[in-house]
UniProtKB/Swiss-Prot annotation:
Its EC number is 3.1.-.-. InterPro entries: GIY-YIG_endonuc, GIY-YIG_endonuc_sf, Slx1, SLX1_C, SLX1_endonuclease, Znf_RING/FYVE/PHD. Coiled coil: none annotated. CDD domains: GIY-YIG_SLX1. Its main location: nucleus. This is Structure-specific endonuclease subunit SLX1. Keywords: DNA damage, DNA recombination, DNA repair, Endonuclease, Hydrolase, Nuclease, Nucleus. It comes from Paracoccidioides brasiliensis (strain Pb03).
């Protein structure tokens, strides 16, 4: 049965709606600065903006973070590297509901031990029962369990800690469990709010702290995209290596001797033997094929401060075109400065015959007291500058005189018409 026109249009619309791999998407863990037992798990493509929403600086906070007695909130850890919004939401739900998630191995789960709690300050175990959902130890244990699962352990994710006490709980838990994380999962520490006063801590939290320094755009692969555009401009002659995605994936997996994986994490280029990350390559390809708007935004030049919005590059180039200025530009410069360019080169060997050089421009050279003196070292030159109206009248007279000279020269040249031809 042939597809209908409506189904074809739906397929076309769905292809147009396909977006490139997002530049950044993460799952985060919030902790109340007032009550450390209050924790929250969420996901966002912009952690700094989302943190401002939770703290009430922007609209759009979650219902559980609206209570003023729990604000401000701090972002203590994030898990980034998701290739889509759906993948981040899937991991977020599994982190929030680890017990009912199909990716968690509950048989060998050490979280089920009752009374297991680790103090963030000392790093020692605390006796007594605690609510699994509000315990920091339980949340980090769930995170460790998901990252060891067969499903999420293949993902190119990265765990980043912004708080030293939370990272201490994480390290203590690693010593209590037998399972280890995959070598491809990186754990990074980025402490900036520890070892400072409470006032400085609140100021950093108001500005999102170290969370605001995260690169949530495509700036990290800007040079990569620019290089690919430069090499692919000439479609007939490409000097770099080209291969199918399936062939390149097989080449990367062959180097690692891995039969269970279908998508590699990284590999070696067969041409230059350089290290290539699969996520970076796929992000560049999807950005080049599906994200033309993102590419234009990435290479858009920022307008300089103080430059009018409607001023283009053409008007800027016109400022420095040539060394000279037009007549209108020179007049405008003279009116704005109020000064004339005076040539003080003497007309003869006598330095006091400068009247002939500057007399046409309205300058008067004289000695102090109006008397001539034999001592040249005591002589001074005083220039009387013209006012703009006088200068304009003088310029008009000068132009009239020039036009008169040109007419007279033309008349004199016409006298050759009456000349006799001598044979």
């Amino acid at each position: 049965m042939a597809p209908s026109i409506q189904s074809l249009s739906m397929i076309h619309d769905s292809q147009e709606c396909i977006k490139p791999i997002p530049a950044f998407y993460c799952c985060y863990l919030l902790r109340s600065c007032v009550r450390h037992a209050s924790l929250y798990i969420g996901s966002t493509p912009d952690p700094a903006r989302r943190l401002a929403q939770h703290n009430g600086d922007r609209n759009g906070a979650a219902k559980r973070t609206l209570r003023e007695n729990l604000r401000p909130w701090e972002m203590v850890a994030i898990v980034s590297g998701f290739t889509s919004r759906v993948a981040a939401l899937q991991f977020e739900w599994a982190w929030q509901n680890t017990k009912v998630s199909r990716h968690a191995d509950l048989d060998g789960n050490a979280i089920q031990e009752l009374g297991v709690r680790i103090c963030p300050r000392t790093g020692k175990g605390v006796k007594g029962t605690a609510k699994p959902r509000t315990s920091l130890t339980n949340i980090l244990a769930n995170l460790h369990l998901l990252l060891r699962s067969p499903y999420f352990s293949k993902w190119p994710v990265e765990v980043r800690f912004f708080s030293a006490d939370v990272h201490r709980v994480w390290q203590v838990w690693l010593q209590r469990v037998d399972g280890l994380l995959n070598d491809g999962i990186r754990v990074v520490t980025d402490f900036a709010l520890d070892g400072i006063s409470e006032v400085e801590r609140k100021e950093l939290l108001a500005g999102a702290g170290r969370v605001g320094t995260l690169d949530v755009g495509y700036n990290s692969i800007k040079e990569y995209v620019e290089k690919s555009q430069f090499l692919l401009e000439d479609g007939e002659r490409i000097n770099c290596g080209v291969s199918h995605l399936s062939c390149l994936s097989s080449h990367f997996l062959k180097d690692k001797d891995s039969d269970s994986e279908l998508i590699p994490r990284e590999g070696t280029c067969p041409a230059c033997y350089g290290k290539l990350e699969w996520l970076t390559m796929m992000k560049e390809i999807s950005l080049r094929l599906r994200g033309q708007e993102e590419v234009n935004r990435l290479f858009r030049r920022r307008r300089q401060a103080g430059t009018p919005k409607g001023q283009g590059l053409k008007s800027v180039r016109g400022r420095g075109r040539g060394r000279g200025h037009s007549e209108d530009e020179s007049d405008a410069l003279q009116v704005s400065t109020g000064l004339d360019i005076v040539d003080l080169t003497p007309c003869s060997d006598d330095p006091w015959t400068i009247d002939c050089a500057i007399g046409e421009l309205g300058g008067i050279a004289h000695r102090p007291g109006g008397e001539s003196s034999g001592n040249d070292s005591d002589a001074t030159i005083t220039l009387e500058m013209e006012t703009p109206p006088q200068r304009r009248r003088r310029n008009q007279n000068t132009r009239t005189q020039r036009l008169g000279l040109q007419k007279s020269a033309t008349i004199n040249l016409s006298d050759w018409d009456d000349a006799e031809v001598i044979e």
